[in-house]
């Protein structure tokens, strides 16, 4: 059943509240928003179109770094209207990033932000992050994923790779990344002012 949920976007869409489901189904069916401005996925004005909260998690779980082929760990920093801002880090702790997603679309984009590729979901059909904010990200991510998967699909499924990374990798947010988070947060908040 989990593989079916990972693959079937209609099933994913049907798992949403009816009001949200309607917005998703009636959203633009595109890989990139036609009025997007800036670097795809990296600019708040050019977010990645996905199908709902589960679509965000599935899309981000399939992203891998182009240069090292590593999956990303992620959590949601916040949201404004239909725009969600996620912090990501490669599972080896070397590549930190911020990505923007727009969740009211009938399917997930097949396009990737610069520096990333999409993995085949069949290779590891697991979620590598959460739509919650994790205070000491990525430490504590495993339990947040467990809560998220139990809530969304009824089964707590934290990937063992997340636990292994939490135990063996020394994650340290670079100061310039911390600055980017502050700037991006202020920018996103300014979009609705």
Question: Residue spans of the language-model regions?
Answer:
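N-terminal secretory-pathway/extracellular module detecting exported/lumenal segments
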Residues: 2-83, 90-193
């Amino acid at each position: 059943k989990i593989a079916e949920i990972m693959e079937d976007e209609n099933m994913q869409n049907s798992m949403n509240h009816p009001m949200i489901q309607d917005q998703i189904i009636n959203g633009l069916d595109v890989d990139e928003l036609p009025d997007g401005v800036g670097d795809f996925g990296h600019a708040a004005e050019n977010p990645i179109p996905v199908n709902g909260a589960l679509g965000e998690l599935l899309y981000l779980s399939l992203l891998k770094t182009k240069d090292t082929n590593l999956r990303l760990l992620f959590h949601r920093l916040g949201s404004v209207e239909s725009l969600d801002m996620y912090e990501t880090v490669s599972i080896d702790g070397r590549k930190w990033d911020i990505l923007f997603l727009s969740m009211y679309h009938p399917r997930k984009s097949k396009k990737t932000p610069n520096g990333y590729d999409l993995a085949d979901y069949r290779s590891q059909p697991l979620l590598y992050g959460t739509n919650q904010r994790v205070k000491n990200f990525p430490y504590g991510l495993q339990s947040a994923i467990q809560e998220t998967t139990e809530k969304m699909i009824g089964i707590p499924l934290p990937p063992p790779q997340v636990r292994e990374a939490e135990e063996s990798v020394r994650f340290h947010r670079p100061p310039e990344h911390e600055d980017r988070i502050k700037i991006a947060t202020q920018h996103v908040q300014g979009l609705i002012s």
